[in-house]
Amino acid sequence: MAKIGVTETVLRDAHQSLIATRMRTDEFEGILEKMDKIGYHSLECWGGATFDSCLRFLDEDPWERLRLIRRKCPNTKLQMLFRGQNMLGYRHYADDLVDYFVKKSIDNGIDILRIFDALNDVRNLETAINAAKKYGGHVQAAISYTTGPVFDIEYYCHYAKQLEDAGADSICIKDMAGLLTPYGTYDLVKALKETVKVPIQLHSHYTSGLASMVHLKGIEAGVDVIDTAISPLAMGTSHPATESMVAALQGTEYDTGLDLKALTEIRDFFNPLREKYLADGLLNPKVLGVDANTLLYQVPGGMLSNLISQLKQAGKEDKLDEVLAEVPRVRKDSGYPPLVTPTSQIVGTQSVFNVILGERYKMVTKEFKDMVAGYYGKTPCDIDPDFRKKICGDEKIIDCRPADLLKPELDTFRNEIAEYYEQEE
């Protein structure tokens, strides 16, 4: 039996990171049966931005994509990314909707649900975790990894224990920004293995150039499964190359058991797609390199490009360094939220406003106000009451689970689209 499991991300996070989730089903359908024979721990193939992208940009049915992958890959576990109470959207949804979406995901072929919350607020995961357990799915609860004064090993061990107690079958260290360092990873994994009994999976983006070393030190510390991407869509803002990690571990006590020759067939299939994406501009060579700003400013690569875009639209591109210096200040003011969807957009946009208007918090976005008021959940650090008053004014402050304020939504949506749909998913 393989010592280290490998989750292949090419069908979801690899192309989400490199080409804005634009890979079409008919582009990868032809290789699925061969991928099913590789022996991966799992195929990450659904959730995250794929659902939105199928509907908004690709004119595809995301449910039919999932059913097709399930038919072609009967022997491999299929995995999705699920944003807890946010599901696959950008706001909190009612419990009945979350429960039903989880049920339908499992019914249509998902085996493993990687469930995370942007604020690491376990309350925002409980409904999704309970639903996945109820309908027979494997719950992989994810820690949104970030850096800052409160984010020490003790913080992560405490959160991991909360996740295990909530019902997690495994735990993923989700390093969405490529902020993990090799030796920091070793210490973190060692501590987590002493704290929880469930398997640990490691997910780290190559943005800062450290992810392969992070994987290796994580494995030495006891990680059970790693996320990789087949080489044509690896590296840069994606993940370490599958073949490289398999070769690095071959013949050691950590041998993955995967066949490099078999992986060559997978690589050869995706190579022409890479060339096509480069030729049509979908794959920008800039995202394939190392972005040292990630290490310097602790800002995820995707967030950095978004900040540049906002400044360009305002004709204030020369203000980038000021905005990058403002981000950690805004993050501190708002309770140190990890910078991942949707909090990265919320903090980033507010930082841009603070700089280009010449006065901090002269204008406050609705989303920033809601986050400070508690409508996204509890922030990792307490927010100063005077700052909260300044931002929120007379708006109601909440400390309950945000979804507790939401009425059931499922029947309302059913009624709204009753005349249009043939089946519910």
Explain the meaning of each model-derived region.
Residues 6-11, 41-45, 76-84, 111-114, ...:
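Hydrophobic faces of well-ordered beta-strands that scaffold small-molecule active sites
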Residues 47-164, 171, 181-182:
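Active-site beta->alpha loop and helix N-cap motifs at the rims of alpha/beta catalytic domains
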Residues 1-19, 66, 71:
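N-terminal amphipathic alpha-helix/helix-capping segment at the start of soluble metabolic enzymes
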Residues 115-118, 175, 221-238:
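Glycine-rich phosphate-binding active-site loops on the catalytic face of alpha/beta enzymes
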Residues 36-54, 284-294, 298-425:
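Terminal or standalone catalytic/regulatory effector modules within metabolic enzymes
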Residues 151-163, 208-224:
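Catalytic cores of alpha/beta
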Residues 234-256:
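C-terminal helical cap(s) of enzyme catalytic domains, especially alpha/beta-barrels
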Residues 36, 106, 164-167, 219:
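Non-catalytic positions within long, well-ordered alpha-helices that form the structural scaffold/packing
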